[in-house]
């Protein structure tokens, strides 16, 4: 797993599932800020959040996702084929991205 931060624009929140061990999996369709490629992202969130927080994600232009990226063989194959990518990301924090000039982030939720 690689620790990293993603700056993405949320295009669509497809689904929210709760697993048996109380984790939440959110399927998002997003676009990276520096690239125009569309990405399907699975966010694994260890603490349960209310649906209102996920509705807030759609309202923001860009968000910063902090956590660890899980690599798998299917991800590597899709990267080589240059198609829509699927990423699985363990989330520790999600920030609202304002502007680099204001240099302020608002913490939405913390692990």
UniProtKB/Swiss-Prot annotation:
Residues 1-98 form the SSB domain. GO terms for molecular function: single-stranded DNA binding. InterPro entries: NA-bd_OB-fold (IPR012340), Primosome_PriB/ssb (IPR000424). It is found in: Plastid, Chloroplast. One of its GO terms (cellular component) is chloroplast. It comes from the Eukaryota. Signal peptide: none annotated. The keyword Chloroplast applies. The keyword Translocase does not apply. Keywords: Chloroplast, DNA-binding, Plastid. This is Putative single-stranded DNA-binding protein ycf41. It comes from Porphyra purpurea (Red seaweed).
């Amino acid at each position: 797993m690689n620790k990293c931060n993603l700056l993405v624009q949320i295009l669509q929140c497809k689904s929210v599932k709760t697993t048996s061990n109380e984790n939440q999996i959110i399927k998002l369709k997003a676009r990276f800020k520096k690239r125009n490629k569309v990405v399907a992202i699975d966010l694994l969130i260890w603490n349960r959040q209310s649906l209102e927080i996920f509705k807030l994600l759609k309202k923001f232009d860009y968000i910063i996702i902090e956590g660890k990226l899980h690599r798998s063989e299917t991800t590597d194959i899709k990267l080589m084929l240059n198609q829509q990518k699927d990423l699985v990301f363990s989330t520790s924090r999600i920030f609202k991205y304002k502007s680099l000039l204001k240099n302020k982030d608002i913490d939405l939720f913390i692990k």
